[in-house]
Amino acid sequence: MQKGKVRNMFSGGNTSKGFFSRFDHIMSREDARRIFVIKGGPGTGKGTFMRNISEIMTDRRYDTEHIHCSSDSKSLDALVIPELKVALLDGTAPHVIDPKVPGAVDEIINLGEYWCDSALAEKRDEIMKVSDEIRVYFQRAYRYLKAAWHIYEDSSTMYGSAMDKVRLNSIAGEFTAMLFDVFPPAGKPGRQRCLFASAITPDGLVSYVDDLMTLDNIYVFEGFPGSGTDIVLERIKTAAVERGFDVEAFYCGFDPDKLEHLIIPEINTGFSTAGKYHSTDACANKRVDFRELLDDSAISKLGPELEY
């Protein structure tokens, strides 16, 4: 018997702005039939609990979404069963969540009820010491990421200064016309679900882009930071939402304000950015190389700074 499909993604990330959470976008309470908020400390089995439920549901041919933890990509922060409008969320730090519509929508599952207090009490000092060390190392890692962002921003600005903005606007116009010209603006805008397709983790960069790009129509934008891929994606996203289409917007795991991938489920269409750190092996309907929009003479003058 065919099993349900599993989609993988992240709702939070270790970014240049520190830990950045989009937990509120996992499932809106307006849509949800039930949201289970799971409490309990590290190691209490929250991720295993969600994986076991996912396995049971996929065996019953339900599709599921695995929302992975950026601090441990093998663990889950949440599980979504879209057809049933049910979500299970890890409600502990760094994304502490409490029921907003208790009883009617939200319900707490406290796995902390099943730990052995006496055994943990014996390890009290060791647990506190390790927790403090983890906090210090995370803070240090975020300082490094913030420092790297300034170099990234400088390079992006230089590439942006050499970009042909007329051609960039033309590309944005071509895609919005191709996709949406037959659709008038809607009375009610579409909704945006904002998450991450990749994350910086203790195992390095983990990406689920290929896992998400399983649509009939896929367009790949190739380019450097600053070459305008995100600008065109934002234009397409805005046009889709204005016409009433719901979208899934996946942002950069390093720069959480930069749009990298876009899915418009209703028209079975996806856009993916391909660069140095991530690309998709999906069969694309069309690839657009944004590096061709850069002025070669301007880039050559910036060469020493960019190489640095």
Predicted regions: what is each one?
Residues 1-27, 166-210:
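N-terminal pre-Walker A segment at the start of P-loop NTPase domains
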Residues 2, 24, 69, 153-162, ...:
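Extended intrinsically disordered terminal tails
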Residues 2-20, 55-119, 125-126, 240-308:
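Conserved nucleotide-sensing/catalytic segment adjacent to the nucleotide-binding pocket
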Residues 27-28, 78:
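Short secondary-structure boundary/capping segments within folded domains
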Residues 34, 184-188, 217:
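N-terminal low-complexity, Ser/Thr/acidic repeat segments characteristic of secreted
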Residues 35-54, 203-206, 214-240:
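Glycine-rich phosphate-binding P-loop
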Residues 126-179, 308:
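An accessory alpha-helical subdomain
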